[in-house]
Amino acid sequence: MEKKYFGTDGIRGKVGERPITPDFILHLGWAVGRVLAQGRQSKVLIGKDTRISGYMFESALQAGLSAAGVDIRLLGPMPTPAIAYLTRTLHAKAGIVISASHNPYYDNGIKFFSSAGTKLPDEIEVAIEAELEKPMQTATSSRLGKAERVVDAAGRYIEFCKSTGPASVDLSELRLVLDCAHGATYQVAPEVFAEMGADITVIGASPNGLNINENCGSTALESLQHKVLECKADVGIALDGDGDRVIMIDQRGEIVDGDDILYIIARARQRTSKLTGAVVGTLMSNLGLEKALATLGIPLMRSQVGDRYVLEMLQCNGYSLGGESSGHIICLDRTTTGDGIVSALQVLVEMVATGHSLYELKSGVVKYPQCLINVQVARSINLHDNNAIINAMQEAENQLGDEGRVLLRPSGTEPVVRVMVEGRDISQVNSLAQQLAQEVAFHLGNPQICP
């Protein structure tokens, strides 16, 4: 059954436009209660990031769950991975996150964790949507759910993050700059690194409900780069609005992205004989990562784009480490979902253990130039049914040989085909990408190429 509301990462959109409206979220809370938390002793956790609309949707979810007879535990502003962890350790039936991740403040969304702290399977999302088609029926007064705050939520998560590194690790020799994106990590992230001894300078930690991800965080790195150089710091750490992704900056002010971080952690796990099987990336992971891992004898498997698919491939194959270029890093030997704080900590631990700088640790990955062009299309189409496009792809692949890749990928959320070409020669890469983009635009009937 095709889903009407759920995308690859829950439900997301612009506040005030359906489905991101108070009445829909009220109904959603009731539907979730009906599906996930049946039974008198059921409880569901609710956490949020720092968007101003989070208060409104928290109240709506709370009312809907209560109407379904479900007890609620309120976490307040809390990183997405913290909600996954607390859902599991507090033995809740489900965890609900109110966040639109790295999006601007005027967007918001709802995503869910199962009792095991993992994302919901498709069949549960389908069941929730089926309940949404029914009118709400409020439980009798004696069976309404109650709400309480979890007063030690932040402390529990801080201790968990610290526990993902060796007990003896001391970060006192490291000078860090931490950018919390005015988001959900603004309280807990500084505490984690400070309690482990690091000398930290914090930016992006003054949320006002409207400034989340605004010129800060993992998608806007300029301020952090400047601060790292100004403070002569060893490392910059940029988290996103809900704390599930991280990008780092080395002492030279250069970006260390998700591919670099994945390589560093993989090499660290291999060094300590703790790497399980292959590393999982995505179709967009840089070819340089694949080549670098190959020199270590570590295979790279590629999933569809999206941390949900990375996690599925990890679980299906019994692997422990995967991630995306965007900074979603999943360390299944430490936690159940992408966690920016935990991932950054693994890198810092490796710096201390080896005595190497972040620049030195990432130097094993030589990135291949990559050109990505978005082509607006008039209609959805199976690209593999178009012989002209297939022939153009094959010709580009032949020109690149073993030293490049071509990827054409329809967007799952907008009428766009993403054309990506990767190779050693940047001029060849750009030329082939432009040729393929023009071919796609010509055959799909809306010859407009977006930046």
From Swiss-Prot:
<keyword id="KW-0479">Metal-binding</keyword>
<dbReference type="InterPro" id="IPR005841">
    <property type="entry name" value="Alpha-D-phosphohexomutase_SF"/>
</dbReference>
<dbReference type="GO" id="GO:0008966">
    <property type="term" value="F:phosphoglucosamine mutase activity"/>
</dbReference>
<keyword id="KW-0460">Magnesium</keyword>
<dbReference type="GO" id="GO:0005829">
    <property type="term" value="C:cytosol"/>
</dbReference>
<dbReference type="GO" id="GO:0005975">
    <property type="term" value="P:carbohydrate metabolic process"/>
</dbReference>
<feature type="binding site" description="via phosphate group">
    <location>
        <position position="101"/>
    </location>
    <ligand>
        <name>Mg(2+)</name>
    </ligand>
</feature>
<dbReference type="Pfam" id="PF02878">
    <property type="entry name" value="PGM_PMM_I"/>
</dbReference>
<dbReference type="GO" id="GO:0000287">
    <property type="term" value="F:magnesium ion binding"/>
</dbReference>
<dbReference type="InterPro" id="IPR005845">
    <property type="entry name" value="A-D-PHexomutase_a/b/a-II"/>
</dbReference>
<dbReference type="InterPro" id="IPR036900">
    <property type="entry name" value="A-D-PHexomutase_C_sf"/>
</dbReference>
<keyword id="KW-0597">Phosphoprotein</keyword>
<feature type="binding site">
    <location>
        <position position="244"/>
    </location>
    <ligand>
        <name>Mg(2+)</name>
    </ligand>
</feature>
<dbReference type="Pfam" id="PF00408">
    <property type="entry name" value="PGM_PMM_IV"/>
</dbReference>
<dbReference type="InterPro" id="IPR005844">
    <property type="entry name" value="A-D-PHexomutase_a/b/a-I"/>
</dbReference>
<dbReference type="GO" id="GO:0004615">
    <property type="term" value="F:phosphomannomutase activity"/>
</dbReference>
<dbReference type="GO" id="GO:0009252">
    <property type="term" value="P:peptidoglycan biosynthetic process"/>
</dbReference>
<dbReference type="InterPro" id="IPR016055">
    <property type="entry name" value="A-D-PHexomutase_a/b/a-I/II/III"/>
</dbReference>
<dbReference type="InterPro" id="IPR005843">
    <property type="entry name" value="A-D-PHexomutase_C"/>
</dbReference>
<dbReference type="InterPro" id="IPR005846">
    <property type="entry name" value="A-D-PHexomutase_a/b/a-III"/>
</dbReference>
<dbReference type="InterPro" id="IPR050060">
    <property type="entry name" value="Phosphoglucosamine_mutase"/>
</dbReference>
<feature type="binding site">
    <location>
        <position position="240"/>
    </location>
    <ligand>
        <name>Mg(2+)</name>
    </ligand>
</feature>
<dbReference type="Pfam" id="PF02879">
    <property type="entry name" value="PGM_PMM_II"/>
</dbReference>
<protein>
    <recommendedName>
        <fullName>Phosphoglucosamine mutase</fullName>
        <ecNumber>5.4.2.10</ecNumber>
    </recommendedName>
</protein>
<feature type="binding site">
    <location>
        <position position="242"/>
    </location>
    <ligand>
        <name>Mg(2+)</name>
    </ligand>
</feature>
<dbReference type="Pfam" id="PF02880">
    <property type="entry name" value="PGM_PMM_III"/>
</dbReference>
<comment type="function">
    <text>Catalyzes the conversion of glucosamine-6-phosphate to glucosamine-1-phosphate.</text>
</comment>
<dbReference type="GO" id="GO:0006048">
    <property type="term" value="P:UDP-N-acetylglucosamine biosynthetic process"/>
</dbReference>
<keyword id="KW-0413">Isomerase</keyword>
<dbReference type="InterPro" id="IPR016066">
    <property type="entry name" value="A-D-PHexomutase_CS"/>
</dbReference>
<feature type="modified residue" description="Phosphoserine">
    <location>
        <position position="101"/>
    </location>
</feature>
<comment type="similarity">
    <text>Belongs to the phosphohexose mutase family.</text>
</comment>
<dbReference type="InterPro" id="IPR006352">
    <property type="entry name" value="GlmM_bact"/>
</dbReference>
<feature type="active site" description="Phosphoserine intermediate">
    <location>
        <position position="101"/>
    </location>
</feature>
